[in-house]
Structures are given as C-alpha cells and as structure tokens.
Amino acid sequence: MEKRLYKKDFDSFVTSLQGLGYKTIAPKKDNNLIMLDEIQGADEISLDHVITNNSIKEFFFPKTEKVLSYRMAKNKVEIEEPEGFAVKAVIFGSRPCDAFSLPVMDKVFNWDCSDKFWVQRREAITIVTIACDKCDSYCFCTSVGLAPDAKQG
C-alpha cells in the first residue's frame, strides 16, 4: 500500500506514533556512521546518506534473545516461553532493497512450519521506505530486480 509522508510532517507523525506506544526507528548519525536506531524526535532523523550501516533485519533478528526458560521440578522440566518480544515499531528511512528482503525471508520462516518470533515481529513492525536519490558501488537493487525508486520493498 503506497502512502506519502512529507518531510514537514515528520515531527507530528513521529510524536503521534510515540503517543500510541510505537517505538520509532530511523537513520540517525552516530559519530561517522548512519545507523537505524530508536529516535525521540524527527530532528534526529538523518536522510543525507546512500544506505545505513545496519539493516532493518537486526530489528527482526536481535543479536541475542531469550527464546525459552526452564525450571527443573522433581522428575519433570517446566518450560516457559517469553512474552513481549514483538514490540510495536515503525522503521522510517529503509531503502527498498533492504525492505525487499522481508518477503523473501517470509517464505523461509513460513515454509514448512511457522516461526512465531518472526511472524509476531513482522506483524508488529511497519516499514516506511524512502527512494534513493544516489547510489554507491555497494548498491545491489538492480541485482534483485528493483530500482532506486522501487515501489515494492
């Protein structure tokens, strides 16, 4: 579904999302890097870059996470599954090539059996992409059948 969000409306949009309990993530300067990271306001958003130094995938695949805990009770093992691992979030400023990876991974994590961690995060996280106005030698959008201004992804 295509919608347009104008730069002048970022601040009120970010504030309203945060008021609704969404974690807001966007490209943000961190020393000499541009990282997708949580922001408090639209003034932290940096859009003058080709691609971020990290991918949206890290918000779907944390580096570490608790997948279960267990307790030994006499002759049996009690297993507890974690709750609240899928946080409502909006990621601004993803490039189409990065967002295009999600439907590909959907096929992997919903093939034979469904990965509930993946599914719940996919349902909880909304991606807002921005078209590219420049590229560098590491860009690969055309390699995956996209273009810098792709509507899919």
Predicted regions and their residues:
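Iron-sulfur-associated redox domains of electron-transfer enzymes in respiratory
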Residues: 1-153
